[in-house]
């Protein structure tokens, strides 16, 4: 993951998207091999986030306000010559532990975590389901236009929706997977999933339960308070 800090805003996105974007710029046709769920843009030191997600090969954007109330503790430690200080918060249905450094005066961090008096180097939930750790800090001499992997992605412009609409999209994707193929003429499309090449509606029906089971088994949203019930 990349935390991309600019003068007025920050972006958080998958590093893999940079490579995919470069391929698209060279004329390649690319599709996602993974769900887009943690792509975020916000103004510096703001709790107002723009969330970018993909569902059924479409790209969406919805706003959210994600205020965090941090408790800064006296405990400190050192990491790569940086002095880190501990902080805690309960947010999104989870308890989080963070380590930030006053030596790097940016009140930002991974995903939606921010508003501590220094850059967040580490943050994880109490059950260790999610664990973000800063690997390196790089100053980019030639500015990369990361809007191509956030505000648009693989040539797709986002459709503006609400959180509620996003939740409905997730439920619909579970109840009616691959619905976009049902109206397409047989022989004009193909889909490879679960090591099977599907070319007709009957094939889609045969993998529906496996697809739904995969969704349930892999569903572990960062923000439990916004989770949908399958």
Feature locations, PLM:
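Extracellular or lumenal secretory-pathway regions
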Residues: 1-76, 83, 96-97, 128-230
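Glycine- and acidic-residue-rich phosphate-binding/metal-coordinating active-site segment common to enzymes
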Residues: 76-79, 83-138
């Amino acid at each position: 993951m990349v935390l991309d800090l600019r003068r007025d805003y920050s972006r958080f996105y998958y590093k893999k998207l940079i490579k995919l974007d470069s391929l698209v710029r060279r004329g390649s046709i690319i599709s996602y091999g993974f769900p887009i769920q943690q792509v975020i843009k916000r103004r510096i030191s703001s709790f107002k986030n723009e969330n970018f997600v993909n569902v059924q090969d479409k790209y969406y954007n919805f706003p959210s306000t994600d205020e965090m109330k941090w408790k800064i503790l006296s405990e400190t430690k050192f990491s790569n010559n940086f002095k880190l200080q501990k902080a805690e918060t309960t947010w999104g249905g989870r308890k989080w532990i963070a380590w930030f450094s006053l030596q790097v005066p940016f009140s930002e961090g991974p995903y939606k975590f921010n508003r501590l008096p220094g850059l967040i180097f580490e943050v994880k939930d109490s059950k260790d389901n999610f664990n973000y750790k800063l690997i390196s800090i790089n100053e980019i001499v030639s500015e990369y236009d990361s809007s191509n992997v956030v505000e648009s992605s693989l040539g797709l412009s986002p459709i503006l929706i609400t959180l509620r609409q996003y939740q409905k999209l997730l439920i619909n994707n579970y109840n009616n997977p691959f619905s976009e193929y049902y109206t397409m003429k047989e022989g004009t499309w193909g889909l490879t999933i679960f090591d099977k090449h599907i070319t007709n509606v009957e094939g889609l029906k045969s993998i529906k339960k496996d697809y739904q089971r995969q969704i349930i088994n892999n569903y572990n949203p960062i923000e439990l308070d916004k989770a949908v019930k399958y």
